[in-house]
Amino acid sequence: MSLVPMVVEQTSRGERSYDIFSRLLKERIIMLSGEVNDDSSNLIVSQLLFLESEDPDKDISIYINSPGGSITAGMAIYDTMQYIKPDVSTICVGMAASMGAFLLSSGANGKRYALPNAEIMIHQPLGGFQGQATDIQIHANRILKIKESLNKILSENTNQPLEVIEADVERDNFMTADEAKTYGLVDKVITKNETGKDK
Protein backbone atom coordinates (compact mmCIF):
# COMPACT_ATOMS: atom_id res chain seq x y z
CA MET A 1 0.00 0.00 0.00
CA SER A 2 1.43 3.39 -0.96
CA LEU A 3 0.66 6.49 1.05
CA VAL A 4 -0.18 9.72 -0.76
CA PRO A 5 0.72 12.87 1.20
CA MET A 6 -1.89 15.60 1.57
CA VAL A 7 -1.10 19.29 1.17
CA VAL A 8 -3.11 21.83 3.18
CA GLU A 9 -3.49 25.37 1.80
CA GLN A 10 -4.96 28.44 3.43
CA THR A 11 -7.49 30.26 1.25
CA SER A 12 -9.79 33.21 1.87
CA ARG A 13 -12.53 30.67 2.54
CA GLY A 14 -10.51 28.59 4.99
CA GLU A 15 -8.33 25.52 4.61
CA ARG A 16 -8.31 23.32 1.56
CA SER A 17 -6.50 19.99 1.29
CA TYR A 18 -5.24 18.30 -1.87
CA ASP A 19 -3.42 15.05 -2.45
CA ILE A 20 0.12 15.89 -3.56
CA PHE A 21 -0.45 14.84 -7.19
CA SER A 22 -3.50 17.09 -7.55
CA ARG A 23 -1.51 19.97 -6.08
CA LEU A 24 1.32 19.36 -8.55
CA LEU A 25 -1.21 19.17 -11.40
CA LYS A 26 -2.37 22.65 -10.41
CA GLU A 27 1.22 23.76 -11.15
CA ARG A 28 1.08 21.89 -14.52
CA ILE A 29 3.36 19.10 -13.27
CA ILE A 30 2.62 15.46 -14.12
CA MET A 31 4.41 12.49 -12.53
CA LEU A 32 5.18 9.33 -14.51
CA SER A 33 6.52 6.93 -11.91
CA GLY A 34 6.57 3.17 -12.11
CA GLU A 35 5.55 0.99 -15.00
CA VAL A 36 4.02 2.44 -18.16
CA ASN A 37 0.73 0.56 -18.50
CA ASP A 38 -2.84 1.24 -19.60
CA ASP A 39 -3.78 2.72 -16.22
CA SER A 40 -0.83 5.12 -15.95
CA SER A 41 -1.20 6.00 -19.64
CA ASN A 42 -4.89 6.87 -19.28
CA LEU A 43 -4.11 9.07 -16.27
CA ILE A 44 -1.31 10.94 -18.05
CA VAL A 45 -3.24 11.39 -21.31
CA SER A 46 -6.22 12.73 -19.33
CA GLN A 47 -4.00 15.15 -17.40
CA LEU A 48 -2.33 16.41 -20.59
CA LEU A 49 -5.71 17.04 -22.25
CA PHE A 50 -7.06 18.73 -19.11
CA LEU A 51 -4.04 21.04 -18.81
CA GLU A 52 -4.31 21.98 -22.48
CA SER A 53 -7.97 22.92 -21.98
CA GLU A 54 -7.00 25.02 -18.93
CA ASP A 55 -4.30 27.00 -20.79
CA PRO A 56 -3.17 25.98 -24.29
CA ASP A 57 -0.20 28.38 -24.22
CA LYS A 58 1.48 27.37 -20.96
CA ASP A 59 4.11 24.63 -20.75
CA ILE A 60 3.48 21.29 -19.05
CA SER A 61 6.21 19.34 -17.21
CA ILE A 62 6.38 15.55 -16.96
CA TYR A 63 8.76 14.14 -14.33
CA ILE A 64 9.78 10.61 -15.33
CA ASN A 65 11.02 7.85 -13.02
CA SER A 66 10.03 4.72 -14.91
CA PRO A 67 11.47 1.34 -15.92
CA GLY A 68 9.27 1.43 -19.04
CA GLY A 69 6.46 -0.94 -19.88
CA SER A 70 3.77 -1.32 -22.52
CA ILE A 71 4.60 0.08 -25.96
CA THR A 72 0.97 0.80 -26.89
CA ALA A 73 0.36 2.58 -23.57
CA GLY A 74 3.56 4.59 -24.05
CA MET A 75 2.65 5.52 -27.62
CA ALA A 76 -0.70 6.86 -26.39
CA ILE A 77 1.25 9.25 -24.13
CA TYR A 78 3.72 10.10 -26.92
CA ASP A 79 0.98 10.85 -29.46
CA THR A 80 -0.88 13.04 -26.96
CA MET A 81 2.33 14.97 -26.15
CA GLN A 82 2.68 15.73 -29.87
CA TYR A 83 -1.05 16.40 -30.35
CA ILE A 84 -1.61 19.05 -27.70
CA LYS A 85 -0.61 22.68 -28.21
CA PRO A 86 1.46 23.37 -25.06
CA ASP A 87 5.14 22.44 -25.05
CA VAL A 88 5.75 19.42 -22.84
CA SER A 89 9.07 19.47 -21.01
CA THR A 90 10.40 16.16 -19.71
CA ILE A 91 12.62 15.71 -16.65
CA CYS A 92 14.28 12.41 -15.66
CA VAL A 93 14.56 11.79 -11.94
CA GLY A 94 15.98 8.41 -10.93
CA MET A 95 15.64 6.30 -14.05
CA ALA A 96 14.05 6.48 -17.47
CA ALA A 97 14.38 3.09 -19.16
CA SER A 98 12.85 1.60 -22.29
CA MET A 99 9.54 3.43 -22.93
CA GLY A 100 10.45 5.82 -20.11
CA ALA A 101 13.58 6.87 -22.05
CA PHE A 102 11.59 7.10 -25.28
CA LEU A 103 9.10 9.51 -23.65
CA LEU A 104 11.95 11.47 -22.04
CA SER A 105 13.50 12.03 -25.47
CA SER A 106 10.12 13.10 -26.88
CA GLY A 107 9.79 16.29 -24.84
CA ALA A 108 9.75 19.69 -26.55
CA ASN A 109 12.97 20.64 -28.30
CA GLY A 110 15.34 22.31 -25.82
CA LYS A 111 13.14 21.32 -22.85
CA ARG A 112 14.33 17.78 -22.11
CA TYR A 113 16.23 17.52 -18.84
CA ALA A 114 17.89 14.98 -16.54
CA LEU A 115 19.08 15.36 -12.97
CA PRO A 116 22.80 14.61 -12.46
CA ASN A 117 22.42 11.10 -11.02
CA ALA A 118 19.63 9.99 -13.34
CA GLU A 119 20.13 6.85 -15.42
CA ILE A 120 18.73 6.37 -18.90
CA MET A 121 18.45 3.08 -20.79
CA ILE A 122 17.36 2.38 -24.36
CA HIS A 123 16.81 -1.01 -25.99
CA GLN A 124 14.71 -2.72 -28.63
CA PRO A 125 11.08 -3.73 -27.97
CA LEU A 126 10.49 -6.91 -26.00
CA GLY A 127 7.67 -9.31 -26.73
CA GLY A 128 6.62 -12.88 -26.31
CA PHE A 129 3.88 -14.97 -27.84
CA GLN A 130 3.02 -18.63 -28.01
CA GLY A 131 0.61 -20.51 -30.19
CA GLN A 132 0.47 -21.71 -33.78
CA ALA A 133 3.49 -20.99 -35.97
CA THR A 134 1.54 -18.61 -38.22
CA ASP A 135 0.27 -16.63 -35.22
CA ILE A 136 3.80 -16.39 -33.82
CA GLN A 137 4.98 -15.09 -37.20
CA ILE A 138 2.23 -12.44 -37.25
CA HIS A 139 3.26 -11.20 -33.81
CA ALA A 140 6.98 -11.29 -34.68
CA ASN A 141 6.28 -9.16 -37.78
CA ARG A 142 4.29 -6.73 -35.64
CA ILE A 143 7.17 -6.34 -33.18
CA LEU A 144 9.60 -5.72 -36.06
CA LYS A 145 7.30 -2.97 -37.42
CA ILE A 146 7.06 -1.39 -33.97
CA LYS A 147 10.85 -1.57 -33.61
CA GLU A 148 11.30 0.21 -36.95
CA SER A 149 8.80 2.93 -35.98
CA LEU A 150 10.36 3.51 -32.53
CA ASN A 151 13.86 3.66 -34.03
CA LYS A 152 12.79 6.30 -36.58
CA ILE A 153 11.25 8.50 -33.87
CA LEU A 154 14.29 8.03 -31.60
CA SER A 155 16.54 9.00 -34.51
CA GLU A 156 14.52 12.21 -35.02
CA ASN A 157 14.50 12.98 -31.27
CA THR A 158 18.26 12.52 -30.86
CA ASN A 159 19.53 13.63 -34.29
CA GLN A 160 21.43 10.34 -34.43
CA PRO A 161 21.57 8.50 -37.77
CA LEU A 162 19.05 5.64 -37.97
CA GLU A 163 21.86 3.08 -38.36
CA VAL A 164 23.41 4.27 -35.07
CA ILE A 165 20.08 3.93 -33.24
CA GLU A 166 19.51 0.47 -34.72
CA ALA A 167 22.93 -0.69 -33.50
CA ASP A 168 22.67 0.97 -30.08
CA VAL A 169 19.27 -0.51 -29.16
CA GLU A 170 20.19 -4.11 -29.99
CA ARG A 171 21.01 -4.70 -26.30
CA ASP A 172 20.26 -2.80 -23.09
CA ASN A 173 22.22 0.45 -23.45
CA PHE A 174 22.64 2.27 -20.12
CA MET A 175 23.74 5.92 -19.99
CA THR A 176 24.51 8.47 -17.31
CA ALA A 177 22.76 11.84 -17.51
CA ASP A 178 25.82 13.38 -19.20
CA GLU A 179 26.07 10.52 -21.69
CA ALA A 180 22.36 10.89 -22.48
CA LYS A 181 22.94 14.60 -23.15
CA THR A 182 25.85 13.84 -25.50
CA TYR A 183 23.71 11.20 -27.24
CA GLY A 184 20.81 13.65 -27.70
CA LEU A 185 18.22 12.01 -25.45
CA VAL A 186 18.14 15.13 -23.24
CA ASP A 187 19.12 18.75 -23.84
CA LYS A 188 20.54 19.62 -20.44
CA VAL A 189 21.64 18.09 -17.15
CA ILE A 190 20.27 20.30 -14.39
CA THR A 191 21.01 20.62 -10.68
CA LYS A 192 18.48 23.40 -9.97
CA ASN A 193 14.94 23.78 -11.33
CA GLU A 194 15.44 25.57 -14.63
CA THR A 195 12.29 24.33 -16.34
CA GLY A 196 10.48 27.55 -15.36
CA LYS A 197 6.76 28.17 -15.37
CA ASP A 198 6.74 30.46 -18.38
CA LYS A 199 9.56 29.07 -20.50
UniProtKB/Swiss-Prot annotation:
One of its GO terms (biological process) is protein quality control for misfolded or incompletely synthesized proteins. GO terms for cellular component: cytoplasm; endopeptidase Clp complex. It is an enzyme of class 3 (hydrolase). Disulfide bonds: none annotated. It is found in: Cytoplasm. Transmembrane segments: none annotated. Signal peptide: none annotated. InterPro entries: ClpP, ClpP/crotonase-like_dom_sf, ClpP/TepA, ClpP_His_AS, ClpP_Ser_AS. The active site is at S98 (nucleophile), H123. Keywords: Cytoplasm, Hydrolase, Protease, Serine protease. The keyword Cell membrane does not apply. CDD domains: S14_ClpP_2 (cd07017). GO terms for molecular function: ATP-dependent peptidase activity; ATPase binding; serine-type endopeptidase activity. Its EC number is 3.4.21.92. Pfam families: CLP_protease. It catalyses: Hydrolysis of proteins to small peptides in the presence of ATP and magnesium. alpha-casein is the usual test substrate. In the absence of ATP, only oligopeptides shorter than five residues are hydrolyzed (such as succinyl-Leu-Tyr-|-NHMec, and Leu-Tyr-Leu-|-Tyr-Trp, in which cleavage of the -Tyr-|-Leu- and -Tyr-|-Trp bonds also occurs). Fourteen ClpP subunits assemble into 2 heptameric rings which stack back to back to give a disk-like structure with a central cavity, resembling the structure of eukaryotic proteasomes. Cleaves peptides in various proteins in a process that requires ATP hydrolysis. Has a chymotrypsin-like activity. Plays a major role in the degradation of misfolded proteins. Belongs to the peptidase S14 family. This is ATP-dependent Clp protease proteolytic subunit.
